[in-house]
Amino acid sequence: MNEEKVLVKGNYAIAQAAINAGCQCYFGYPITPQTEIGEYLSGKMQELGRAYVCAESELGAINMVMGAVSTGVKAMTSSSSCAVALMQEALSYAASDELPVVLVNVMRTGPGLGYIYPAQGDYNQAVYGGGNGDYKIIVLAPSTVQECVDLT
């Protein structure tokens, strides 16, 4: 078997893998270091006749995803650290309603608004949940770009 090897950034790999997995809608809001996912999908989704919306805020993006997946459409958003913290109430509603929300958290370090370089500080928030209620969500934590593709 002759497989082509491609060198690509993790953000681009996740975006293309989402397309390959049949994602029909992407709702996002730009925040470093995940902005490349939205940039990539802004062109590709249009070419494929799929929906791309740059939301007015992170809260708008996660709520649009919840609306889309509640109708049976494969949809996703991506964000980073402090913006994911803003989404916690919506994520607890998604868990309560058992909605298949896909949220890519390209983490960055630091408390508050943090810094713009990658880190793993949000892992506990993702695993243990930051919203109200006693719930667990499925967390896939890739450690390589290949795993980003395989797990998307």
Identify the role of each PLM range.
Residues P118-T152:
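Conserved thiamine diphosphate
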Residues M1-G129:
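Thiamine diphosphate
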